Design a protein with these regions (language model features):
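GIY-YIG nuclease signature motif recognition
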Residues: 26, 66
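Compact, charge-rich alpha-helical regulatory domains located at protein termini
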Residues: 36-65, 82-87
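Conserved mixed alpha/beta catalytic, RNA-binding, or beta-rich assembly cores of soluble enzyme
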Residues: 6-25, 33, 42
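C-terminal structural segments of small proteins and small subunits
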Residues: 70-103
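Gly/Ser/Thr-rich helix-start
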Residues: 22, 49-52, 70-73
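Extreme N-terminal starter segment of soluble prokaryotic enzymes
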Residues: 1-3
Length: 103
């Protein structure tokens, strides 16, 4: 299982980003809470459709779930099309991934 978390910084000790589509970074973890990938979001400055573009990018990376403080309606629609679960949750990235995997 791959879980992507929208992050304010490129660091697992960062805060979860309040916005999914325009989050500055994404960190991807495996089912053991291990960070397996991190990257800058190339769609933060896109005029429109950032959330849809992020959903497609995460699908291409094989992500099963994405976590952010909030999601726009177009992004949630795109995630549902890609069959990616989504969860609105805040806090520190490192704590959030552990909490989600415990549930």
């Amino acid at each position: 299982m791959k879980i992507a978390i929208a992050s304010v910084q490129n660091d697992k000790n960062s805060e979860v980003s309040d916005i999914a589509g325009r989050a500055p970074y994404y960190l991807i973890f495996n089912e053991n809470s291990e960070l397996i990938d991190s990257f800058e979001n190339p769609f933060t400055e896109q005029k429109g459709g950032a959330g849809v573009a992020v959903a497609k990018m995460l699908a291409e990376k094989g992500v099963d779930m994405v976590i952010a403080g909030a999601f726009g309606e177009k992004m949630t629609d795109a995630l549902e099309v890609e069959e990616i679960e989504y969860l609105e949750k805040g806090g520190l990235v490192a704590e959030t991934i552990k909490e989600v995997l415990r549930e």
